[in-house]
Curated annotation (Swiss-Prot):
This is Acylphosphatase. PROSITE patterns: ACYLPHOSPHATASE_1 (PS00150), ACYLPHOSPHATASE_2 (PS00151), ACYLPHOSPHATASE_3 (PS51160). GO terms for molecular function: acylphosphatase activity. It catalyses: an acyl phosphate + H2O = a carboxylate + phosphate + H(+). Its EC number is 3.6.1.7. InterPro entries: Acylphosphatase (IPR020456), Acylphosphatase-like_dom (IPR001792), Acylphosphatase-like_dom_sf (IPR036046), Acylphosphatase_CS (IPR017968). Belongs to the acylphosphatase family.
C-alpha cells in the first residue's frame, strides 16, 4: 500500500469538500483523513493501491460542484502512522 498527501487549493473550504472527499474515499476504499488547513486549503492523506490513489487524485482535481479547485499538490507521505478507516478531522 502507498501513502500520499494531497494539498488542494482553491475555493475548497465551506463548500462541503471534506464531506464529499470522505464519501468518495469510502467508495474507492482508501484509508486516511481529510482536514481543513489554516491557509484555506484542504489536506488529504490517503493509503491505498496505485489505482485507488489515482482515482482519488482525479476526483480531487474536480471536487464537488460547489467547489472550485485551482491546484492539487501530491507528494509521498512518510509518517509511519497506520489508518483503520477514512475520517474527517476538525
Amino acid at each position: 500500500m502507498l501513502k500520499k498527501q494531497f494539498i488542494v487549493y482553491g475555493l475548497v473550504q465551506g463548500v462541503g469538500f471534506r464531506y464529499f472527499t470522505w464519501k468518495t474515499a469510502m467508495q474507492i476504499g482508501v484509508k486516511g483523513y481529510v482536514r481543513n488547513r489554516d491557509d484555506g486549503s484542504v489536506e488529504v492523506v490517503a493509503v491505498g493501491s496505485t489505482t485507488q490513489l489515482a482515482q482519488l487524485h482525479t476526483w480531487l482535481t474536480q471536487g464537488p460542484r460547489t467547489a472550485s479547485v485551482e491546484q492539487v499538490i501530491e507528494q509521498e507521505y512518510a509518517d509511519s502512522r497506520e489508518f483503520t478507516d477514512f475520517s474527517v478531522r476538525y
